[in-house]
């Protein structure tokens, strides 16, 4: 568990994150937890795994630098991807979807040769019959993708048999 602990400590101690990793359960953070759960510790030897943050300070010269980018091109954490110097210091950039990969390649001219996609995944779900008289909705993405509008509209609808669950990675 030495390597996994190192990766987790770095993610949690990153001062540039809006929320500490241990307190964050967004998509990228959940994906890292799955990766750590299913891959053996030795898989992370010599790897510097950087979570969705193109910050020069997170590069480690003696490691294989892998940026795992879950953010869209318009987020401040992606800005340094426009710097050829920064991109040259990365060994790999891993994207969470083909769509996100394509947008980054287009926006930042990222070399496809140092990019790959590991699609989002979830644990297996055992489906059980649910009551038909209540509808449960979930908002599972970042707040800046319209959460403020959703909450306002949802409250205005005043629906009696519909519940909205918000699962976001930053404070509202």
In which residue ranges do the predicted regions lie?
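N-terminal pre-catalytic "stem/leader" segment of glycosyltransferase-like enzymes
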Residues: 1-54, 58
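Short loop/helix-cap segments at secondary-structure boundaries that form the rim of catalytic
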Residues: 42-43, 55-62, 87, 107-109, ...
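Active-site proximal beta-strand in glycosyltransferases
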Residues: 47-77, 91-95, 116-118
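Acidic anion/phosphate-binding donor-loop and adjacent secondary structure
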Residues: 77-78, 105-106, 116-136
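A conserved, positively charged/aromatic
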Residues: 80-91
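A short, active-site helix/loop in glycosyltransferases that binds the activated sugar's phosphate group
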Residues: 91-114
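Carbohydrate-associated surface elements
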Residues: 99, 121, 170
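Conserved catalytic-core segment of nucleotide-activated headgroup transferases in glycan assembly
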Residues: 124, 131-172
């Amino acid at each position: 568990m030495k390597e996994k602990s190192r990766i987790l400590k770095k993610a949690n101690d990153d001062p540039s994150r809006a929320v500490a990793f241990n307190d964050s359960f967004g998509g990228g953070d959940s994906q890292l937890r799955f990766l750590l759960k299913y891959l053996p510790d030795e898989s992370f030897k010599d790897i510097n795994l950087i979570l969705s943050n193109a910050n020069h300070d997170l590069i480690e010269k003696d490691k294989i630098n892998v940026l795992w980018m879950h953010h869209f091109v318009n987020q401040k954490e992606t800005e340094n991807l426009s710097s050829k110097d920064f991109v040259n210091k990365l060994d790999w950039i891993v994207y969470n979807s083909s769509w996100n990969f394509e947008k980054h390649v287009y926006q930042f001219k990222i070399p496809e040769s140092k990019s790959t996609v590991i699609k989002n995944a979830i644990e297996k779900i055992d489906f059980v019959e649910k009551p038909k008289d209540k509808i449960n909705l979930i908002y599972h993405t970042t707040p800046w993708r319209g959460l403020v509008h959703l909450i306002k509209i949802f409250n205005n609808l005043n629906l009696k048999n519909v519940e909205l669950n918000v699962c976001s990675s930053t404070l509202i």
